[in-house]
Amino acid sequence: MNQSMVRSVGEAVDDAVKQLDFDRLSREYWDQNEFLFIPQFLTRSVVEEHLVPQAQGVKSELNRNFIPGHKKGGSVSYYTVIEKAPRFLDLYRSSAFIDFLSRLVQAKLSLCPENDPHSCALYYYTEPGDHIGFHYDTSYYKGARYTILMGLVDKSTQCKLVCELFKDDPVKSPKHLELITQPGDLVIFNGDKLWHSVTPLGEGEERIALTMEYVTNPDMGTFKRLYSNLKDSIAYFGLRTVFKQAFTPSNRRS
C-alpha cells in the first residue's frame, strides 16, 4: 500500500517497515557503530497530514529552557503527548516498528516506563539561536537505551543534527556528519555511543523533531532515577512536569 493512501499513522508505519531493505540497513547500522539514517521512513505527506498538526497544536505547552554554553530550546514531554498529541503514540507503540528496531539492534526492546518524560517527546527550535551542544543520550537504565529521532518540521538551513561517529573508538577514525532532518526522516542510534549536537537556529527559521526512546531493561536505580529527574526538570521539561509524574507507577508496556 502506498503511504499517501493510508488512513492512519499505524497503517503508514506498517507499510514503511515492510518496504525497508533490512539486510542493507542492518549492515549500515553496525558498520557505523550503531547509528543509522533512513531518509523518508514516512512520507512527507503522511507526516504533514497526521503528525505536524499535533506538534503545532501543543506548542503552547512547551517548556523553554536556557543553559548557557550548552542548550536553548523548547520541549513537550511524553505526558503532554499522551493527553494532547496521541497520534505520535501510534508510531512509538507500533509493534511492527518495535520488532524492526529489536531486530536491528539485536536485542529485545521495550517501551520506557510510563513515568519517563523522554519516552516519546517533542523538541522545538523556534527562536534564533536555539541549539543543543554536544552530548551523549546516556542511559541511566540497567541496560542500553536507544534513541529514535524523526524530523517533523525543518524550515532551516542552519539548524542541523551534527554527529561524530566513532568518537571514542580506539581503532577507527572519527566520522563527521551534518544532517538536515526533513519530515519523515529517521535517525536511530545507541544513546551511549553517538556524540551529537544541534547547531543554532537562524532568524525566521523553525525546526521540530520527535524523539522516541526504547530500552533493553526498564529498571533504574533510585539514585540514578533522582539524578535523571533533576536533569530533565532543569534541561528539558520543568520541575512541575517531571516531579508531578516522577513517582507515578510505571505501568510498563513492551
Say what each PLM segment does:
Residues 82-86, 166-170, 193-198, 211, ...:
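A general structural signal for short secondary-structure boundary/capping elements
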Residues 89, 99-193, 205-209, 216-225:
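Catalytic core of non-heme Fe(II) oxygenases with the double-stranded beta-helix
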